[in-house]
């Protein structure tokens, strides 16, 4: 399909637009979409728990995060994929002890937006009020930050690993998509990135 193996990572905090952009980009470029959040949600559902409950369980069970990472690294090694998740760039870059290896990423993207904007998006998506969405986001972020620091010794909000950081509150969904395509297209045209 492409002259290179394409591995694009998209990370961001809840409500920043990562899933929307990852889906659209995967469809546009004909890439697989491997989504850490979906894997995590499926694991929670299998145990009959909501995300908050399962996040608490995951704090004491690093095997949950390690399994998600292994699946993402395998997908990166296969190539032609968009990896979505807060640690996707770390996984693709081979930066974590249990997934050491060469940096497989073609492009590492971090999407961000202010908490209030993200809370409004999550509230709309999940059919809850904004205050509840804000509370859930803050709890989830606190839980994830704790897990990631304890399990991996990394701070997923350290943006130095990323090639592109974009505030999605400044543009519409279509404009954000266009900006990301403008960053990706030249990389896919090169024979040797």
UniProtKB/Swiss-Prot annotation:
Pfam family, one: Cytidylate_kin2
SUPFAM superfamilies for this protein: P-loop containing nucleoside triphosphate hydrolases (SSF52540)
Keyword Kinase: yes
Residues binding ATP: 12-20
GO cellular component: cytoplasm
GO biological process, alphabetically ordered: pyrimidine nucleotide metabolic process
This enzyme's EC code(s): 2.7.4.25
Known catalytic reactions: CMP + ATP = CDP + ADP; dCMP + ATP = dCDP + ADP
Location of the protein in the cell: Cytoplasm
Coiled coil (UniProt feature): none
Keywords recorded for this protein, A-Z: ATP-binding, Cytoplasm, Kinase, Nucleotide-binding, Transferase
Record InterPro entries: Cyt_kin_arch, Cytidylate_kinase_dom, P-loop_NTPase
GO terms assigned for molecular function: ATP binding; CMP kinase activity; dCMP kinase activity
First-listed, main subcellular location of the protein, grouped into a coarse class: cytoplasm
Entry-linked NCBIfam families: cyt_kin_arch (TIGR02173)
Family per similarity comment: Belongs to the cytidylate kinase family. Type 2 subfamily.
Protein name: Cytidylate kinase
Record lineage: Archaea, Methanobacteriati, Methanobacteriota, Methanomada group, Methanopyri
Gene that this sequence comes from: cmk
């Amino acid at each position: 399909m492409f002259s290179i193996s394409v591995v694009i990572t998209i990370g961001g905090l809840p409500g920043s637009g990562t899933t929307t952009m990852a889906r659209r980009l995967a469809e546009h470029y004909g890439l697989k979409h491997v989504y850490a959040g979906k894997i995590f949600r499926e694991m929670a559902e299998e145990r009959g728990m909501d995300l908050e409950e399962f996040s608490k369980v995951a704090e004491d069970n690093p095997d949950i995060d390690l399994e998600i990472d292994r699946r993402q690294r395998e997908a990166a090694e296969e190539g032609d994929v968009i990896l979505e998740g807060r640690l996707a760039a770390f996984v693709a870059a081979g930066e974590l002890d249990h997934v050491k290896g060469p940096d497989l990423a073609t492009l590492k993207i971090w999407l961000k937006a202010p908490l209030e904007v993200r809370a409004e998006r999550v509230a709309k998506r999940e059919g809850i009020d904004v205050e509840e969405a804000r509370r859930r986001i803050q709890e989830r972020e606190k839980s994830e930050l704790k897990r990631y620091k304890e399990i991996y010794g990394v701070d997923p909000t350290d943006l130095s690993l990323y090639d592109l950081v974009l505030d999605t509150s400044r543009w519409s969904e279509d404009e954000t998509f266009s900006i990301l395509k403008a960053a990706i297209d030249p990389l896919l045209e090169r024979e040797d990135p």
